[in-house]
């Protein structure tokens, strides 16, 4: 039986692949796919304006290929986890 951490990692991977490849490369997120993922999977997503999502995409897209690959996605989740951790500390 998978541990809770194994399950969490599987969920993060599954969510990436749920949205990647709806258009174009199935191993990356386009701007449209990233926007949909953020809006549907993150509580803060519905509060973000389009311009904020575009800025986030630009920040995440380290290699500037106009798509977010899995490594860039995981980097985003790591940064988000750090923000959540700080918020929980007080």
From Swiss-Prot:
Membrane topology designation: Peripheral membrane protein
Protein residues bound to Ca(2+) 2: 61, 63, 65, 67, 72
One of the Pfam families matching this protein, by short name: S_100
Domain EF-hand, chain residue ranges per copy: 12-47, 48-83
GO cellular component: cytoplasmic side of plasma membrane; cytosol; extracellular space; nuclear envelope; perinuclear region of cytoplasm
Record PTM N6-acetyllysine, positions in chain: 40, 47
Amino-acid positions noted as binding Ca(2+) 1 in the UniProt annotation, renumbered to this chain: 28, 33
Cross-referenced Gene3D superfamilies: EF-hand
Residues recorded as bearing N6-succinyllysine in the entry: 47
MF terms (GO), sorted A to Z: calcium ion binding; calcium-dependent protein binding; S100 protein binding
Subcellular location: Nucleus envelope; Cytoplasm; Cell membrane
Protein keywords: Acetylation, Calcium, Cell membrane, Cytoplasm, Membrane, Metal-binding, Nucleus, Phosphoprotein, Repeat
KW tRNA-binding (keyword) present: no
Tagged with keyword Cell membrane: yes
General function of this protein: May function as calcium sensor and modulator, contributing to cellular calcium signaling. May function by interacting with other proteins, such as TPR-containing proteins, and indirectly play a role in many physiological processes such as the reorganization of the actin cytoskeleton and in cell motility. Binds 2 calcium ions. Calcium binding is cooperative.
Summary of subunit composition and partner proteins: Homodimer; head to tail assembly of 2 subunits. Interacts with CACYBP in a calcium-dependent manner. Interacts with ANXA2 and ANXA11 (via N-terminus). Interacts with SUGT1. Interacts with TP53; has higher affinity for TP53 that is phosphorylated on its N-terminal domain, and lower affinity for TP53 that is phosphorylated on its C-terminal domain. Interacts with tropomyosin. Interacts with FKBP4. Interacts with PPP5C (via TPR repeats); the interaction is calcium-dependent and modulates PPP5C activity. Interacts with TPPP; this interaction inhibits TPPP dimerization.
Name of the protein described by the UniProt record: Protein S100-A6
Gene giving rise to this polypeptide: S100A6
